A protein has these predicted regions:
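Positively charged n-region of N-terminal signal peptides that target proteins for export
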Residues: 1-6, 20-21
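C-terminal motif of bacterial Sec signal peptides marking the signal peptidase cleavage site
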Residues: 15-18
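Mature secreted bioactive peptide module from preproproteins
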Residues: 85-211
Length: 211
């Protein structure tokens, strides 16, 4: 009887050790994968900011699905949308130049996670003499996987008369399986618009990939 009890005790001990080793290996694998993601996508640690708001909680795999979609489409050039509205000031029109990019987030195995979109809208005032004056820039996103925060845009004019704009914004994630840490990923936005032709192009690129 004692030998039977001893046998079962040994089995339980070996099972516990095996489970502990498996959990340890799994933790090390997750940590290693996350370190690789940091290097690949340019992930940075972030601090709580009232402007960022409540950041959705996602797994590292879900975050990677978003960032990989952006990385793979970094060279995609899209056409601007625009519309003329009532001007901010008397004797002029307001031109809204809108840039929208839609993506599908998928895991490494190809499983669909979510479709999401990024949108930048830049407002200009056009006076009666054709003068173009920058008003403001707004950033919006359609997703529950992250928060997107941008601050204005840098604008200049080329010799051909094109308005060129660029900015660096940030995607914020709270990663549930990495200690619920808060991280941010820089996204570069570049575009140009010709107000005479009413045409323009733009692109979104992970800043890490752009360097």
């Amino acid at each position: 009887m004692k030998s039977i009890k001893f046998f079962f005790a040994c089995v339980l001990a070996l099972t516990f050790v095996a489970c502990s080793n498996a959990e340890s290996d799994s933790f090390e694998d997750n940590s290693s994968n996350f370190e690789s993601m940091i290097s690949l996508y340019g992930i940075q640690s972030a601090t709580v900011d009232s402007k960022v708001g409540d950041v959705p909680s996602v797994t590292a795999e879900e975050m990677a699905s978003v960032l990989e979609a952006l990385r793979q489409n970094g060279n995609t050039i899209r056409n601007c949308e625009s519309k003329t509205l009532e001007g901010y000031y008397e004797g002029g029109d307001r031109k809204e130049v809108k840039m929208i990019a839609e993506y599908q987030a998928r895991t490494r195995s190809g499983a669909f996670v979510e479709q999401f979109a990024l949108c930048v809208s830049i407002n200009f005032n056009i006076d009666n003499n054709g003068g173009v004056f920058y008003i403001d820039t707004t950033y919006s996103s359609s997703t529950d996987l992250f928060n997107w925060q941008g601050y204005g845009a840098s604008l200049s004019t080329t010799a051909e008369g094109n308005s060129v704009f660029s900015s660096t914004s940030y995607l914020y994630f709270r990663v549930s399986d990495q200690g619920n840490c808060l991280v941010k990923v820089p996204v570069s936005f570049k575009g140009s618009y010709n107000f005479k032709d009413n045409k323009g192009t733009y692109s979104f690129t992970l800043s890490k990939a752009a360097n």
